[in-house]
């Protein structure tokens, strides 16, 4: 049945988190740092990709991911390098995607897993077990013959529900992983789609590295999935994800405040810009300094 509500409860914790997140989003967007600073956006995008792939056991460090995306040679497994390039490509096309389109979801999976899996850009044809980072089985995915209808039903619910998008996007994330529609790449695509949904609520989320925060709290991420699996509904996972989103916003605002004229004098602000650049680059050229410091 279309638009069937997935099982979850709206708790006081969620309501408080949503209020705080809305306030933080307002503060972040008022500074205009993300929209006005392409270097900061690229840095956050790289952190996003590194975080999401690291959750899936990609071995590249943040510095190596940066080097790959800067066109440099990196000594690493070809599969890991391909994952970085594929992920960057689809994140760069985020604005083109319709978050409620099954076809766009399949397109995103096709790009994310291009050259890496046989069933790329299509729903899986075989049963699959879902495991955590230690190889423990969390649950078994939906039988393949039911996957297309369940994904369509989930997207229809997300599109038509009047529940706040902050909650809807978290519900999608959990239910998508529960269905496990693809042979591989479910985690990467699920987190991408969560970001996509949030970006439709507020464009700032397209550049907010929530995936990096999930990676930093990976044991909690899997614990929340396990707890929700045991409960048969996604309430605990939603609460975890809202806390991760809030933490990402606080981090972004802190970075933004450090870069603002009100927080430091112009010379110190320029040094902070350069330090931030060097977090994801091996070196800095004179031309980069001129762009960063507007000199």
Model-flagged regions — what are they?
Residues 1-295:
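FIC/Doc superfamily catalytic core
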């Amino acid at each position: 049945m279309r638009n069937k509500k997935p099982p979850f409860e709206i708790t006081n914790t969620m309501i408080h988190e949503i209020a705080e997140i809305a306030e933080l989003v307002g503060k972040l967007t008022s500074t205009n740092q993300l929209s006005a600073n392409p270097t900061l956006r690229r840095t956050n995008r790289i952190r996003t990709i590194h975080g999401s792939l690291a959750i899936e056991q990609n071995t590249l460090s943040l510095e190596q991911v940066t080097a790959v995306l800067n066109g440099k040679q990196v000594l690493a497994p070809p599969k890991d390098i391909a994952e970085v390039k594929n992920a960057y490509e689809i994140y760069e096309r985020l604005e083109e995607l319709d978050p409620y389109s099954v076809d766009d979801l399949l397109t995103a999976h096709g790009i994310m897993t291009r050259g890496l899996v046989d069933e790329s850009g299509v729903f899986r044809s075989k049963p699959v077990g879902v495991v955590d980072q230690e190889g423990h089985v969390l649950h078994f995915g939906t039988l393949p013959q039911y996957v297309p209808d369940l994904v369509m039903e989930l997207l229809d619910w997300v599109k038509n529900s009047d529940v706040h998008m902050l909650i809807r996007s978290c519900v999608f994330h959990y239910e998508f992983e529960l269905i496990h529609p693809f042979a591989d790449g479910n985690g990467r695509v699920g987190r991408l789609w969560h970001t996509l949904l949030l970006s439709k609520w507020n464009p700032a989320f397209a550049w907010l590295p929530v995936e990096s925060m999930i990676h930093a709290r990976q044991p909690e991420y899997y614990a929340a999935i396990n707890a929700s699996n045991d409960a048969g509904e996604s309430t605990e996972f939603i609460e975890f994800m809202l806390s991760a989103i809030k933490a990402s916003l606080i981090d972004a605002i802190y970075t933004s405040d450090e870069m603002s004229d009100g927080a430091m004098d112009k010379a110190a602000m320029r040094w902070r810009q350069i330090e931030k650049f060097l977090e994801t680059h091996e070196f800095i050229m004179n031309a980069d300094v001129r762009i960063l410091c507007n000199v």
